[in-house]
């Protein structure tokens, strides 16, 4: 079984670091990378991932806002 994953962080190095660590797991597929909360919501709606690594402190639409928006869906 493949674990479809989305990485969300406004820091490119954080995304790269997560990506490098997750490559060690054959059953993890990174389906998208997002730089902000609004991109994340669109991506989650499109890809319907099993797992989302979500940065909480992002400018503008932060991680808490993403969680709130998804809870309202």
Q: What does each model-identified segment do?
A:
Residues 42, 64-73:
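Short amphipathic alpha-helix used as the core "switch/output" element in two-component signaling
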Residues 58:
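Receiver (REC) domain active-site loop signature in two-component systems and cognate sites
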Residues 9, 55:
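Active-site residues of response regulator receiver
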Residues 36-39, 61-65:
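Acidic catalytic/metal-coordinating carboxylates
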Residues 1-4:
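Non-catalytic signal-transmission and effector/linker regions of two-component phosphorelay proteins
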Residues 33-51:
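Acidic, metal-coordinating helix/loop segments flanking the phosphotransfer/catalytic sites
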């Amino acid at each position: 079984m493949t674990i479809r994953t989305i990485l969300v962080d406004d820091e490119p190095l954080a995304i790269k670091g997560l990506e490098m660590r997750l490559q060690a797991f054959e059953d993890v597929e990174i389906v998208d990378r997002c730089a902000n909360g609004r991109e994340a919501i669109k991506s989650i709606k499109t890809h319907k991932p099993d797992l989302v690594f979500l940065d909480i402190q992002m400018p503008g639409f932060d991680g808490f806002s993403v969680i709130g928006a998804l809870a309202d869906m």
